[in-house]
Amino acid sequence: LSTSNNHALVIGASIAGLCAARVLSDFFHRVTLIERDELPSVPHGRATVPQDRHLHMLMARGANEFENLFPGLLTDMVAAGVPMLENRPDCIYFAAAGHALGTGHTLRKEFTAYVPSRPHLEWQLRRRVLELDNIEIVRGLVIEPRFEPTTQTVSGVLVAPPDDDDGAEPQFLAADLVVDAAGRGTRLPVWLSKWGYQRPAEQSMDIGINYASQQLRIPDGLIQEKVVVAGVAHDRSLGLGMLCYEDGTWVMTTFGVAGAKPPPTFGEMRALAERLLPARFNAALAQSEPIGAPMFHAFPASKWRRYDKLDRFPAGIVPFGDAVASFNPTFGQGMTMTSLQAGHLRRALQSPHGDLATQLNRATAKTTYPVWTMNAIGDISFHHGLTQSPPAWWRPAGALFDQFLGAAETDPVLAEWFLRRFSLLDSLYIVPPPRLIGRTIAHNVGLWLRERRQSASSRGRTLTAPRSP
């Protein structure tokens, strides 16, 4: 990190960039976000962020982290109509890998989550960032950072004017630190190669996700749950999710994995819902009213750029958010992982020892690894995911977890444990402790014995039934 903390610059003003800017504002005199889009003054989607029209989950852990970063955020979201999920049995219907979790009981531990639309959450964060005197958002397109070979340092970025200002010349903005929060389209690996550094190795998981989403109105009172999820399974490549948003509308997102195409019309989406959801949801959908046309999006692969493995890294620049790791969006963990990385950035900036990039990249890897690994096991086991040389233990682990989820259908203790771990609340590792593994085995053995007794009883009744004369 430069000895001068005069100016920090962030590439991208989406959720990751806003989180980074909020942290940087406590350490730098000025923070500038460079954003190519003209940002809306109200909650509204952007053409360059096509994923914001589809279902987004803000996990309970992410809500806590965002509140720490932006105090008062959760209260303001609820005041704006954002649904809040508490530990009541009627808040969520969650079917994971073909197993409908037994969440029909009040959770024993506190569990509070929030369901903002992606545009609303981004608007809330942007509003708070712009209230800080030392942060500004500048519209423009980053051409490339300026690299100083003599000091092996990035000293700023060259910024092109927005598309509607063709006559203006590119401008150089000097900075003591550049944060690349450009998302999945990051060009940092290319820049590193150009500057004489090694590109980071990439771990990828080909999942071939295709989305189709429909906004709709459902009359009040027909659905008690605010979150409805029926994920894909090893024998079914289609799934769906429904969320109730802050304006009272719902979004219904259908998705396919391994290249499977989701239904393209609302009528066909409803037909899929009839196959995947209990009858009460379909009765409500029968009275729903679609708003606008369906919207589509594709997510071919999850990627993790292993900056933590590099021996050399230039000073004055760090990667952040999806520029480091982009997760399978059907797990809904991306925004929460970004909020965790904001904490890593703060601690790295506070540390008097070591270089910033090394500390941030290593801390990010420590929280990315368990979530990436658990997601990869799920992708291999249930989503027909493809990756290079997967560890031999992944598929057996997926099969064991399938047994756990099967038991969690009727055991609320197991269901609550999974829901909290899936929300990244208690730990980033989804590894059941021995007592829960024992509970799972006992539960499944009990089910097997009951089925055996019922089968034997049925055969006995058949053998002793009187013959017809």
What are the functions of these language-model segments?
Residues 346-469:
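C-terminal helical "tail/cap" subdomain of flavin- and related membrane-associated enzymes
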Residues 97-118, 156, 254-257:
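Helix-loop-beta segment of a Rossmann-like dinucleotide-binding subdomain
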Residues 38-40:
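Helix N-cap at the beta1-alpha1 junction of Rossmann-like dinucleotide-binding domains, i.e.
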Residues 3-34:
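N-terminal Rossmann-like FAD-binding beta1-loop-alpha1 element of flavoenzymes
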Residues 131-272:
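Predominantly flavin-linked oxidoreductase catalytic cores and closely associated redox partners
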Residues 23, 27, 43-94:
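N-terminal FAD cofactor-binding segment of flavoenzymes
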Residues 57-58, 108-127, 181, 187, ...:
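Short beta-strand to alpha-helix junction loop
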Residues 260-374:
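FAD/FMN-dependent oxidoreductases across multiple families
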